Amino acid sequence: MFQIGELAKRCGVSTDTLRFYEKNQLIAPAGRSESGYRLYDDKNQQQVLFILKSKSLGLSLDEIKELLEIKLEATEHSCAEVKSITTAKLELIDEKIHELTRIRSALEKINDACCGEVDDDASHCSILEALAGEEVHGGEKCCEDR
């Protein structure tokens, strides 16, 4: 058994992070010392590493908590329950990718319509016009029509 500072060091996180995980019921100390300090064990270390790996895959704290609960009572749950969590996350990621692709395409279109000249003022900038909802010059770059 070891104190919070040792667990933080072993996992490469701050003690504040561990307290946050504890507050959000992702981990619980294995016990307390006679003087009241939280004590942790190897199981806690594995839980923290599980949390960190899950976070690196984009899972939310709620999703991680649900997965940890399933892991702790694995014989009472199915792989299908676990897979439903990751499948839902994949669907959300795909939606975000689609939205970001749409945004990138629209931004690239207005960006390409601008000449980007340093010596020209922005009074006829096609990017500003497009963002203001104004008609952008008929395919010409913003500085070419002058």
Regions found by a protein language model. Give the residues of each.
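Basic helix-turn-helix/winged-helix DNA-binding cores
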Residues: 1-71
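C-terminal regulatory/oligomerization modules of transcriptional regulators
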Residues: 75-146
